[in-house]
């Protein structure tokens, strides 16, 4: 699995066990991702932060 890093088109190959790509947004500015990468479990959204997770190559 390969996930984008903070600035596409750059990406990295995910380590073993981290099988999801994710994007993290601040709820206040939901158009600009704050963080991207590989993760093992999709975090829950909170009042301030929203996560978008997916399990295909470079989908974040």
Swiss-Prot record:
This is Cytotoxin 5. It is found in: Secreted; Target cell membrane. Monomer in solution; Homodimer and oligomer in the presence of negatively charged lipids forming a pore with a size ranging between 20 and 30 Angstroms. Belongs to the three-finger toxin family. Short-chain subfamily. Type IA cytotoxin sub-subfamily. One of its GO terms (cellular component) is other organism cell membrane. It comes from the Eukaryota. Shows cytolytic activity on many different cells by forming pore in lipid membranes. In vivo, increases heart rate or kills the animal by cardiac arrest. In addition, it binds to heparin with high affinity, interacts with Kv channel-interacting protein 1 (KCNIP1) in a calcium-independent manner, and binds to integrin alpha-V/beta-3 (ITGAV/ITGB3) with moderate affinity. Expressed by the venom gland. Disulfide bonds join 3-21, 14-38, 42-53, 54-59. Gene3D superfamilies: CD59. Is classified as a S-type cytotoxin, since a serine residue stands at position 27 (Ser-29 in standard classification). GO terms for molecular function: toxin activity. One of its GO terms (biological process) is killing of cells of another organism. InterPro entries: Cytotoxin_Cobra, Snake_3FTx, Snake_toxin-like_sf, Snake_toxin_con_site, Toxin_cobra-type. CDD domains: TFP_snake_toxin. Keywords: Cardiotoxin, Cytolysis, Disulfide bond, Membrane, Secreted, Target cell membrane, Target membrane, Toxin.
């Amino acid at each position: 699995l390969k996930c984008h890093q903070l600035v596409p088109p750059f990406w990295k190959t995910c380590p073993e066990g981290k099988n999801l790509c994710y994007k993290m947004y601040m709820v206040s500015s939901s158009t600009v991702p704050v963080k991207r990468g590989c993760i093992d479990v999709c975090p829950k959204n909170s009042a301030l932060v929203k996560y978008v997770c997916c399990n295909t190559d470079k989908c974040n």
